Swiss-Prot record:
Domain of life the protein comes from: Eukaryota
Protein name: Metallothionein-like protein type 2
Single GO MF descriptor: metal ion binding
InterPro entries listed in its UniProt record: Metalthion_15p
Keyword Lyase: no
Lineage, uppermost ranks: Eukaryota, Viridiplantae, Streptophyta, Embryophyta, Tracheophyta
Record-stated family: Belongs to the metallothionein superfamily. Type 15 family.
UniProt keyword annotation of Metal-binding present: yes
Species assigned in the record: Brassica campestris (Field mustard)
Keywords: Metal-binding, Metal-thiolate cluster
Pfam families attached to this UniProt entry: Metallothio_2 (PF01439)
Job of this protein: Metallothioneins have a high content of cysteine residues that bind various heavy metals.
Length: 80
């Protein structure tokens, strides 16, 4: 399992990819220098909090104004 859970992420130059290569949705939880062969991940789930001022574009990752749509294509490609 990738650290982004297989979710699409936007990288530099408005190139989309899978896993850790873009939005960094989940931090790298591995530690270097250890010789363990297994890792334990604990993820919690909480209800989303929304307010009337929330920006539109739900469900997309954003990186430098580059948005990645659900089909793993940049939408729109406006990286600066």
């Amino acid at each position: 399992m990738s650290c982004c859970g297989g979710n699409c992420g936007c990288g530099s130059g408005c190139k989309c990819g899978n896993g850790c290569g873009g939005c960094k949705m989940y931090p790298d939880l591995g530690f270097s220098g250890e010789s363990t062969t297994t890792e334990t991940f604990v993820f919690g789930v909480a209800p989303a909090m929304k307010n009337q001022y929330e920006a539109s574009g739900e469900g997309v990752a954003e990186n430098d104004a580059c948005k990645c749509g659900s089909d793993c294509k940049c939408d729109p490609c406006t990286c600066k």
